[in-house]
Amino acid sequence: MSELKKIIEERRSANNFIEGVKIPDKDFTEIFELLKLDPSCFNIQHSHYLVVTDEGKKEQLRKAAFNQYKVHTASAVILVLGDKLAYKNSENIYSGMLNLGIMSKLDYDNTIRDINNLYEGRGEDFQRSEAIRNTSLSAMMFMLIAKDKGWDTCPMIGFNQDEVRQIFDIPENYEIALMITMGKEDSSKRRMRGYRKPVGEFVSFDSFQ
């Protein structure tokens, strides 16, 4: 069995965590160093991760998450944010390649023009959906890397967006795509894995039918 296959098969959405377990700073650093390689449209890197380990702030989050107990027992709660205006930072992202001669001035100008045309031409709804779409790709990669480091996770959308935004003073240009609880799963309370559709029910080739 390949290591990736093993990680995918062992990853579960943990509903119960062992309370009081601390995640070393070293683990967070190693996870996020790998996560830098996640994909994003035009490499403009929409994602921002707000890591909450402070017990007081976690309890505030728990209240905003309708008192879900796993927010209390998790070692950390990660808010995964997507920047709707990430495209406006594209010049900074690509300037290094221009300065190093990896990209010509013509290619640089054309790339920046294409990015601006895409995001500004399609408007605010597209900017929002792109922030969520790209950040969700990143979040899945985060959970796989965390599992590889021995940590369990659970993606969540059951929380009051406005309350969470207010608690952490999150700027309006950031969408809260999801929340991830993280820690060591209490596997004694684990439920059986839910039913999964056969491949033939969710995969088709060359046409939908």
Question: Positions of the model-derived regions?
Answer:
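Acidic, surface-exposed loops and disordered segments
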Residues: 1-209
